[in-house]
């Protein structure tokens, strides 16, 4: 941690550039995607669902405004909403299914004390209208004005802690209040608070499934948030509110925002000048008189391990009260991380989209270990390690496609950390298999497939092996045996069968590389199970019943949403055979027929790429599809369609993402695609090559420190086709490159043109 402080100080000094020079962090706009609007998206899933608040790269703390508590509002914030309830120290990014976190909600107020947010006209509350004119979101910084109170609120973060600066008006009854029960999508069911001294509090908030959250409790989220908070203004008149919540009252989702529930909280007992309190619904407040424009600060360390961990996190990272210093360090950290990829050319808006996308890929997987390496394990006990950083929020079904392949190039340590975290979780929890959607040690079981298996296979083949290989293999094998194309699985839907088949191919590859010859053919054979649900009469994949008969074919055919397909239709899901594209082509009647159908799939897609029945960039099942043209011998079609997707599906503004950010996946796809390279098959170190959005892209490989540069001469929105290429000065006629070639550094140079060169890359 001392190294972090020294590094941040050095970076802060180095980033003092002229006002005319923009750094990568200056291009970041955290408002991009910060909408949950189902109306704008045209589908219930909504848009990006990102949060606009302050964070550091892969940090534990995200300090952000919260506009609503209940409903399917994962980030806690939506740009369209008019009120802010407060500012929380933890958030999820880009997820649906009700979300979670949003803990330790801080709200500066004036006037009479209110203990509910004020969602119901019958019960006045502490929430406030806020000024859009004053709202600022930058990498590592957020600010707005709460207009009901005329309080200007600013916040910034270190990796495990955050600091807030409030500028108050003249008022004899100013206040900072903290709702300790608050939780996105539910509530904390039990809290503890201790007054340490006249300016410090510490405590915890338990968040079990009974309190809702992640999937309204179905995701089994069960964690405790610990805090250690200091105030710049000593306590004089302080206290707590303590609501009596009867047994049997639902504490999930919309229940905790109902008038019935808020009425219970509104009757809370006020406890003055206490030392310690524990209860089912607690909040803390400190009242004080302020002069006009008086500044009061609050800072807190957060931990998922202990109160001592929270204290250590705060005192290590933010020992003083210099808000601007913490802000400068946060920006410096972002500049260092974002500089792993540099771009030239393109418009200012395209640069903003690119660096914001790269920023969003660096929110998760977040650290959950304290500064000393202590973390909460899968056995609900504290553990300590210096071998890796415990990480969480593994949205596997999404992120194996682009997010982890991207990080394998620029941040291989993050990939290694996540694999270690999943393997240790399988070990400590006693579950013995790798979770597909992990959240703070919870086995959520969300989505389908065994996505941790391709993440491990992709890492291993790329030389990322800083974990217990045999444990990783064992738990990967257990995963495909528990959830896979196994004999006892009779009914066969499309999504699971195809996803499991790919995972089993990855397991076969791992068996080959890790010395398990007896498993190679077993899983290679199971990887071919996808052929069993191909209906030659319909010419497409079709789900089967448990007795082996076909499910009835719908009137809309392969366009029928959710017909054997998860968050997709068979037309979208059916392309997912990345491990055997030639085999898929054979089923379809040959390459020419497959290419024609695939091109038609794109031709019928709406230009804005919003949720639709064809190429649906708004959701993950199709994310590897554009790169299949390279594998089919028509690389100019990959060039054409990738450029169009990048131009039309990714924009500036709160509606800039056509679908949920999904913990970095939506943005990682863009970062790789706009850079001109993306895998068609994770687990195969081959990257497909195509035309980049920018004239120059320089990628620093995290494993070697060497820079791989892609240059596109004559590049423009019209000149999207590669005419010729050289690699390190020598002619290059392949439409792909190996991971090791990227790590070695070098220069790949294209000449671009307005018409396809159908001889290049064949």
Predicted region positions:
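Bacterial Sec-dependent N-terminal signal peptides
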Residues: 1-21
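Accessory carbohydrate-recognition regions in carbohydrate-active enzymes
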Residues: 20-404, 408-498, 511-532, 538, ...
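ATP-dependent phospho-/nucleotidyl transfer catalytic cores
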Residues: 503
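Conserved catalytic core of nucleotide polymerization and phosphodiester-bond processing enzymes
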Residues: 712
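Extracellular attachment/recognition segments
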Residues: 721
């Amino acid at each position: 941690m001392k190294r972090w402080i020294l590094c941040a100080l050095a970076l802060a000094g180095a980033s003092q550039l002229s006002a005319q020079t923009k750094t990568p962090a200056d291009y970041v706009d955290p408002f991009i995607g910060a909408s949950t609007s189902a109306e704008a998206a045209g589908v219930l899933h909504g848009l990006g669902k990102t949060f606009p608040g302050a964070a550091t790269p892969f940090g534990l703390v995200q300090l952000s405004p919260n506009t609503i508590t209940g409903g399917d509002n994962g980030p806690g914030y939506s740009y369209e909403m008019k009120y802010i309830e407060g500012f929380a120290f933890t958030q999820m990014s880009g997820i649906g299914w009700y979300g979670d976190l949003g803990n330790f909600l801080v709200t500066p107020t004036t006037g009479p004390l209110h203990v509910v947010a004020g969602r119901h006209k019958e019960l006045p509350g502490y929430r406030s209208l806020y000024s859009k004119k004053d709202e600022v979101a930058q990498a590592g910084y957020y600010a707005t004005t709460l207009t009901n109170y005329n309080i200007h609120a600013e916040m910034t973060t270190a990796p495990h802690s955050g600091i807030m600066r409030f500028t108050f008006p003249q008022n004899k009854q100013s206040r900072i209040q903290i709702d300790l029960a608050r939780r996105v999508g539910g509530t904390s069911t039990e809290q503890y608070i201790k007054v340490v001294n006249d300016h410090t509090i510490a405590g915890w908030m338990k968040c079990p499934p009974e309190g809702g959250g992640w999937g309204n409790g179905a995701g089994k989220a069960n964690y405790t948030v610990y805090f250690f908070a200091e105030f710049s203004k000593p306590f004089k008149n302080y206290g707590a509110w303590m609501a009596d919540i009867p047994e049997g009252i639902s504490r999930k989702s919309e229940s905790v925002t109902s008038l019935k529930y808020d009425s219970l909280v509104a009757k809370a007992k006020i406890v003055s000048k206490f030392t310690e309190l524990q209860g089912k619904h607690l909040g803390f407040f400190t009242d004080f008189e302020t002069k006009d424009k008086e500044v009061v600060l609050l800072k807190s360390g957060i931990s998922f391990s202990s109160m001592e961990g929270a204290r250590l996190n705060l005192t290590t990272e933010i020992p003083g009260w210099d808000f601007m210093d913490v802000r400068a360090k946060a920006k410096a950290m972002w500049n260092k991380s974002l500089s792993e990829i540099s771009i030239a050319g393109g418009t200012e808006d395209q640069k903003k989209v690119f660096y914001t996308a790269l920023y969003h890929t660096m929110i998760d997987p977040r650290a959950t270990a304290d500064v000393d390496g202590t973390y909460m394990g899968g056995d609900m006990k504290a553990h300590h390690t210096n071998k890796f950083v415990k990480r969480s929020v593994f949205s596997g079904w999404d992120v194996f496609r682009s997010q982890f392949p991207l990080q394998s190039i620029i941040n291989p340590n993050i990939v290694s950390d996540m694999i270690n975290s999943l393997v240790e979780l399988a070990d400590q929890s006693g579950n013995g298999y790798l979770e597909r959607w992990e959240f703070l040690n919870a086995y959520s079981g969300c989505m389908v497939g065994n996505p941790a298996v391709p993440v491990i296979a992709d890492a291993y083949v790329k030389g990322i092996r800083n974990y217990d290989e045999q444990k990783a293999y064992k738990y990967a094998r257990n995963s495909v045996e528990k959830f896979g194309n196994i004999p006892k699985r009779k009914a066969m839907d499309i999504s699971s069968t195809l996803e499991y088949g790919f995972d089993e191919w990855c397991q076969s590859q791992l068996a080959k590389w890790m010395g398990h010859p007896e498993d190679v053919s077993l899983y290679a054979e199971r990887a071919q199970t996808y052929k069993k649900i191909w209906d030659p009469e319909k010419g497409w994949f079709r789900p089967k019943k448990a007795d082996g008969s076909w499910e009835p074919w719908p009137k809309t055919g392969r366009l029928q949403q959710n017909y054997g397909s998860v968050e997709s239709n068979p037309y979208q899901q059916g392309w997912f055979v990345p491990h055997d594209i030639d085999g898929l082509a054979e089923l379809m009647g040959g390459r020419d027929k497959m290419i024609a159908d695939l091109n038609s799939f794109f031709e019928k897609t709406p230009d804005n790429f919003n949720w639709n029945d064809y190429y649906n960039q708004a959701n993950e099942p199709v994310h590897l599809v554009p790169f299949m043209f390279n594998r089919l011998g028509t690389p100019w079609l990959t060039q054409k369609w990738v450029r169009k997707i990048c131009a039309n599906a990714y924009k500036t503004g709160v509606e800039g993402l056509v679908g949920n950010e999904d913990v970095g996946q939506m943005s990682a796809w863009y970062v790789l695609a706009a850079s001109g390279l993306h895998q068609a098959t994770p687990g195969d170190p081959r990257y497909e090559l195509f035309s980049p959005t920018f004239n120059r892209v320089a990628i620093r490989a995290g494993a070697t420190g060497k820079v791989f540069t892609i240059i596109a001469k004559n590049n423009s929105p019209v000149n999207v086709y590669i005419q010729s290429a050289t690699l390190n000065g020598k002619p290059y006629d392949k439409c792909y490159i190996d991971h090791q070639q990227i790590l070695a550094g070098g220069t790949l140079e294209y000449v671009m043109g307005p018409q396809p060169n159908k001889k290049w890359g064949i």
